[in-house]
Amino acid sequence: MRIVFAGTPEFAAEHLKALLDSPYEIVAVYTQPDRPAGRGQKLMPSAVKALAVAHDIPVFQPQTLRNADAQAELAALKPDLMVVVAYGLILPQVVLDIPRLGCINSHASLLPRWRGAAPIQRAVEAGDAESGVTVMRMEAGLDTGPMLLKVVTPISAEDTGGTLHDRLAEMGPPAVVQAIAGLADGSLQGEIQDDALATYAHKLNKDEARIDWTRPAVELERLIRAFNPWPVCHSMLDGESVKVLAANLSTGQGAPGEILSASKDGLVVACGDQALSLTRLQLPGGKALSFSDLFNSRREKFAAGKVLGQ
């Protein structure tokens, strides 16, 4: 079977690795154009491109798949199937129709819940009990196609956006290989999604990471986990932006953002409802540290009565 793979970040690269180890022929890889990255803003290849180049697979990086030249280029590859994972470009219907068996997508949620760009983080933020990967047939709508198979994992009270991402990146690739086998032998037909159950996972926005201490502590604790490792929740203290990487629910009352107490166990801050104990912080110019380490060296910065967010 001739497969074209389309994907961009590390999550997608894990899927490409599994396909390279499968019996199927990867005839080409599509990925986003190289982007400036790092302090020097050098053009850097995507994780998928780096892997493809290492395996001598032809790489295509069109700005769009909406023009006739790009579509003709894809058609010339004569793909039986296109596997799409976190690619980042919209595939118009004419592209979806090119492969003999169509296009399939590995999506990091239990569809139809959390269609869209940031399903992993939104599941943690919402306090969902479980997440997973759905392999589906692609159609013109956003993550709306018939579902071929699902794999499920519980979301623990300690999971972050990062830990859930890594777990799903391990679960998704074998599911895709299994789905391809089911398509090839005709055993997988697909289950229509119930649009009434659909929710949308909006793209992450850095502005969302600024902590609003008037919100309930339970919501903020989930947000802090969801936005770790990116974009990372933060709040102002003494005119500096302090990153908050971990927190636990606590008790206490005060003005939202007010420091209620500080000890080696954590920095207790009042919220709109209850309080949070901040247990891992990063000060400007420094590295992430447990609050017990910060408390030893910067005790005066975290005096009770100070207010975060100002």
UniProtKB/Swiss-Prot annotation:
Gene Ontology CC: one annotated term: cytosol
Gene3D superfamilies registered for this protein in UniProt: Formyl transferase, C-terminal domain, Formyl transferase, N-terminal domain
Catalyzed chemical reaction(s): L-methionyl-tRNA(fMet) + (6R)-10-formyltetrahydrofolate = N-formyl-L-methionyl-tRNA(fMet) + (6S)-5,6,7,8-tetrahydrofolate + H(+)
Function noted in UniProt: Attaches a formyl group to the free amino group of methionyl-tRNA(fMet). The formyl group appears to play a dual role in the initiator identity of N-formylmethionyl-tRNA by promoting its recognition by IF2 and preventing the misappropriation of this tRNA by the elongation apparatus.
E.C. designation(s): 2.1.2.9
Official protein name in the record: Methionyl-tRNA formyltransferase
Family of this protein: Belongs to the Fmt family.
UniProt source species: Pseudomonas putida (strain ATCC 700007 / DSM 6899 / JCM 31910 / BCRC 17059 / LMG 24140 / F1)
Gene name per UniProt: fmt
